[in-house]
Amino acid sequence: MFLDELPEFGPRVLEVLRQPIEDKIVTISRAQGTLTFPANFQLIAAMNPCPCGYYGDAVKPCTCSAGTITKYQKRISGPLLDRIDIHIEVPRVAYEKLSDQRLGEPSAVLQARVETARQRQRERFTEKRASHGPSANQGATQLDCQITCNADMRPAEVRQFCQLDDTGRSLMKSAMSQLQLSARAYHRVLKLARTIADLAGAEQIAPAHLAEALQYRPRGVGG
């Protein structure tokens, strides 16, 4: 689902997204009762940095006051931002880049890399289910069957499949303090780092994979 001009949506509309993003279900309550539906989707959103759109621009000055910018950005709550794994600032594109005739990496190559990473994840969780065996706890096995990709991992799977070396643990410890990461953000960063490692074809999460995952977090949002 793509939401353009994210701050222009009403606060109640945006806050309703928190449950389906986190739990992949949506609950509707009416006088006659409550119904729960599956809501497994990928959220992509875009927004300007301020109402005029030029806050932080290197060429055109912003015409908004500091208070206006703060009020505009606060339309999106910290808990909602905390549930979005990848935050990217898109600066003005220079003429030289727009007119460059060199082609980037072909989409077919990117697609193949993603498909390989997803296959790696499916095999990882299939092996985990097989290791339980028929005598494993039935409830746990049913939950495991729902996991097909890194995004579906719960804390137990994160601890098993997202282990860090000493350098990675030191980096994560510093990031928890400097970026004020919540417990939710901690697990989301590790899952994203595991995906970055899978895309690189790496068996273990390297510090570089973790550093890339951390740079996608919004600054100052801890949940």
Model-derived regions, located:
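Basic, amphipathic alpha-helical bundle interface domains used for macromolecular binding and assembly
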Residues: R12-G223
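Hydrophobic positions in the central parallel beta-sheet of the AAA+
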Residues: M1-F2, I88
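Walker B catalytic acidic pair
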Residues: D4-E5, V16
